[in-house]
UniProtKB/Swiss-Prot annotation:
Any one GO biological process: hydrogen peroxide catabolic process
Record key words, sorted: Heme, Iron, Metal-binding, Oxygen transport, Phosphoprotein, Transport
Classification lineage: Eukaryota, Metazoa, Chordata, Craniata, Vertebrata
Tissue specificity note: Red blood cells.
Record's protein name: Hemoglobin subunit delta
Example GO molecular function: metal ion binding
Amino acid sequence: VHLTGEEKSAVAALWSKVNVDEVGGEALGRLLVVYPWTQRFFESFGALSSPDAVMGNPKVKAHGKKVLGAFSDGLAHLDNLKGTFAQLSELHCDKLHVDPENFRLLGNVLVCVLARNFGKEFTPRVQAAFQKVVAGVATALAHKYH
């Protein structure tokens, strides 16, 4: 991902304030609610029958935290996202057979959650930088599919 120095600083500054536990659970939960077909990859998580069930599901929250932990690793290696996410790309492609479009959807949901959580601090300029990052992460995660 090509970010200017200013964009990298904006992303790092905002991300340093993110509560990975909460934001991860909310982002994954929203993905499962807004795009219900993504739930098929999480059948072992139990109750996903309603938005409240999804958003309150401890397994969704735990996996969301794990997802954002990996995203945090990516932020530390913006110049090598493909390498950073190579193993996760292989896992999601070869073993889990996740539709790579889901990575893009999750990135966009994450941007929505950040906007909701940070309000005016999540300026259009910050959003533009994050959109580049989530697009780069989605591309890196989809790499094994090509």
